Structure formats: structure tokens, C-alpha cells
From Swiss-Prot:
Subcellular location as annotated: Cytoplasm
Family from the record: Belongs to the SmpB family.
Signal peptide feature range: none
Source organism: Anaeromyxobacter sp. (strain K)
Protein's job: Required for rescue of stalled ribosomes mediated by trans-translation. Binds to transfer-messenger RNA (tmRNA), required for stable association of tmRNA with ribosomes. tmRNA and SmpB together mimic tRNA shape, replacing the anticodon stem-loop with SmpB. tmRNA is encoded by the ssrA gene; the 2 termini fold to resemble tRNA(Ala) and it encodes a 'tag peptide', a short internal open reading frame. During trans-translation Ala-aminoacylated tmRNA acts like a tRNA, entering the A-site of stalled ribosomes, displacing the stalled mRNA.
UniProt keyword RNA-binding present: yes
Record SUPFAM superfamilies: Small protein B (SmpB)
Main location: cytoplasm
Amino acid composition bias (Basic and acidic residues), ranges on this chain: 138-157
Listed HAMAP family: SmpB
Protein known as: SsrA-binding protein
One GO biological process term: trans-translation
Stretches for region Disordered: 138-163
Keyword annotations: Cytoplasm, RNA-binding
Gene encoding the protein: smpB
Length: 163
């Protein structure tokens, strides 16, 4: 049994299983939501090992539910007979009002739901979804140039402080 002081810090910690770094480069993320994941036992064990790929994954509403598609969770080696399909569609758990709000925004032209990271929060697998609009090639170049100029300014300021 956990004590009150020790349990809160451990519960508040989030263990990130995977992050989609490419999503922030390819998309302009405007809003984020947290959703639970419906997983099998072998999928949870694979996630805890970090055996997941979010690079081509996206979420979309189907009927009254939200689904995560193209998220590859690798097979768990010790689950020989009771494994899972690595690319199966996975149901996302959100409140009805949140699902309706997300559906309204996704149905607008040009928006998509992109998983930004999968993590464990108090032992439960969660996914952070971002409402995103795709960037054009020119926008990506502009973002790179802006990031480089910010780095140069920070370096110049750091050099100025040292003197």
C-alpha cells in the first residue's frame, strides 16, 4: 500500500512510450486532446518496451467513436500464441462531448488528427492527439529558417553574457 506522500509523485509521473517528432514538423498543431487507448495485454507490454511507431498514424471518427489508424505496435516476443496484429485499428476513449467537438473540427477542410505521443499515466495508456493542418513545402522551409535564426540569436546572447 502506498503512503500518501510517496504515491502522489509516482502517480503524477508520465512515462512516454513513443513520440511523433515528425508531426510537429509536417503539421501546424492548433489544439491537443488526451484520449485513452483500448489495447490487448500483449500490446501494453510492447508499448512498455517502446516497440511502437507513430510516423504514419492518424485518428478519425467512425460513427460515434474515435479510432487510431496505422499505429504500428510491434508484436510482443513472449506472447507467441496470443499475440496481436501490429497494424490493427485501435479504439480511442474520450468523453462524448469531446468526441463531438473533435469531429466538428476534423470535418472542416484541411484538418486531421495526429497522435503526438503515447504515454502511460497512472498505469493507463494514453495518446495525445493534435488537431493539425498540413504544412506546405515552403512553410516547412520557413519554419526551419525561423528556428535557425532563433538559435543564432540565442547563441549571440549567450556569448554576450559570458563577456
Amino acid at each position: 500500500m502506498k503512503g500518501k506522500a510517496g504515491g502522489k509523485a509516482a502517480d503524477a509521473a508520465e512515462k512516454v512510450a513513443a513520440s511523433n517528432r515528425r508531426a510537429r514538423f509536417d503539421y501546424d498543431v492548433e489544439d491537443t486532446w488526451e484520449a485513452g487507448l483500448v489495447l490487448t495485454g500483449s500490446e501494453v507490454k510492447s508499448l512498455r518496451e517502446g516497440n511502437v511507431n507513430l510516423s504514419d498514424a492518424y485518428a478519425m471518427p467512425r460513427g460515434e467513436e474515435l479510432w487510431l489508424l496505422n499505429c504500428r505496435i510491434g508484436e510482443y516476443q513472449q506472447a507467441a500464441h496470443f499475440g496481436h496484429a501490429p497494424l490493427r485499428d485501435r479504439k480511442l476513449l474520450m468523453n462524448r462531448a469531446e468526441i463531438d467537438r473533435v469531429r466538428g473540427k476534423v470535418e472542416q477542410r484541411g484538418y486531421t488528427l495526429v497522435p503526438l505521443r503515447i504515454y502511460f499515466k497512472q498505469g493507463w495508456a494514453k495518446v495525445e492527439l493534435g488537431l493539425a493542418r498540413g504544412r506546405s513545402h515552403e512553410d516547412r522551409r520557413g519554419a526551419i529558417a525561423e528556428r535557425e535564426s532563433k538559435r543564432e540569436m540565442d547563441r549571440a546572447l549567450a556569448r554576450g553574457r559570458r563577456r
